[in-house]
A protein has these predicted regions:
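Membrane-embedded alpha-helical segments of multi-pass membrane proteins
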Residues: 88-92, 127-135, 158-167, 227-235, ...
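Juxtamembrane segments of multi-pass membrane glycosylation machinery
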Residues: 70-88
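Transmembrane-helix motifs of polytopic, lipid-linked glycan transferases
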Residues: 87-105
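Membrane-embedded helix bundles of polyisoprenyl
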Residues: 108-126, 130
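Membrane-interface transmembrane helices that cradle and orient dolichyl/undecaprenyl
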Residues: 136-147
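Alpha-helical transmembrane segments and terminal signal-anchor/GPI-anchor hydrophobic tails
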Residues: 7, 22-56, 65, 69, ...
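Start-transfer (signal-anchor) and selected internal transmembrane alpha helices
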Residues: 1-22
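Signature aromatic-anchored transmembrane alpha helix within multi-pass, membrane-resident enzymes
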Residues: 182-191, 297-314
């Protein structure tokens, strides 16, 4: 029975990822190239034509994301169509997301994830963080602790932000059995505020000190509007107040969703680009909404679906300007 269920999960994930990545012409729909895609294409072409990049050792080597460098080189050597090679990475990332997602939610709920501009940007454009976090989701469902550690290390060497996602999980895991629900959710909001303050005032100084190329990125990227982020903070509040749990995993997932949705809100106040973090953990947010009482759950799903369609309208209008 378990093997049959796993087979169905991977089949659904395969079909979902294939349709989303290869059959929907996202670039034609929005009428312009994705910025990160253009940067990846330029890097592949540059390296294939004999271009060179700096090489590091020690901590700088880890922070330089060596596995992603290897993947970029491998894509250039393996594929003649470099854009197709990036779509292949999108497909793998979505497949890993799907293997996690379809074990925990009804099929129709996937449409909420699908019809969301943030998800399009994540899966089609920001393929590096999609692949890295997808590996973490895949590792979560493995039984072997050794494999979990190895895969987490690989994910870190694809995208250096992965320790943030891992660290938040273990903080929530630590407090889960030590505090009651009300304090637990106050802690999640406190973690989110602490993250925003750290990324605003501390992270850039650390990255500059170690000579990391990501130093100053937050200032360049800028923040999202408070009006946009407050919607996600409202959803976080609904989960914190009304969610019911059957086990520790569900409580931790809910806390995880609350942390990053709250961080998005606080980040918008401080001018930090927090939208991407919500996009990355979108499956966990949707799973956490599933812990709400039926009438609140359905209403929240409907609200998210409607809000996503509205954001698509706004997104398309911006791309046409």
């Amino acid at each position: 029975m378990i093997k049959e269920q796993n087979y169905r999960v991977w089949l659904l994930a395969f079909l979902y990822a294939g349709i989303y990545v290869f059959l929907i012409p996202w670039v034609d729909i929005i009428g312009k190239e994705f910025e990160d895609t253009a940067n990846y294409l330029f890097r592949i072409i540059y390296l294939q034509e004999g271009g060179t990049e700096a090489h590091y050792s020690g901590i700088k080597w880890l922070l330089d994301e060596p596995v992603w460098r290897f993947i970029i080189l491998a894509l250039g050597e393996t594929f003649n169509d470099y854009r197709l090679s990036l779509y292949f990475i999108s497909f793998i990332g979505m497949l890993l997301y799907g293997s996690f997602f379809f074990r925990r939610v009804e099929f129709y709920v996937v449409m909420i994830l699908l019809l969301n501009p943030m998800s399009v940007n994540l899966f089609i454009e920001q393929v590096r963080i999609t692949l890295a976090f997808g590996l973490l989701l895949f590792a979560y469902d493995l039984s072997s602790k050794y494999l979990k550690i190895v895969i987490a290390l690989i994910a870190f060497m694809i995208h250096a932000s992965m320790p943030i996602f891992i660290g938040i999980y273990f903080i929530l895991y630590y407090y889960n059995s030590r505090v009651e629900a009300r304090k637990y959710y106050l802690i999640t909001v406190g973690i989110a505020l602490g993250m925003a303050l750290f990324m605003k005032f501390g992270l850039n100084a650390i990255l500059t000190a170690v000579g990391d190329r990501h130093a100053g990125y937050g200032d360049i990227a800028g923040g999202s509007s408070i009006a946009y982020s407050i919607v996600w903070f409202m959803i976080a509040s609904i989960i914190a107040i009304f969610a019911n749990f059957e086990n520790d995993e569900e409580r931790i997932f809910a806390g995880y969703a609350i942390v990053f949705m709250s961080f998005f809100f606080f980040g918008s106040i401080f001018g930090i680009y927090g939208q991407r973090y919500v996009a990355v953990i979108m499956p966990i947010i949707i799973i956490a909404i599933g812990y709400l009482p039926p009438h609140i759950k359905q209403g929240t799903y409907l609200f998210m679906f409607s809000y996503s369609l509205l954001m698509f309208k706004y997104w398309f209008e911006l791309t046409l300007i």
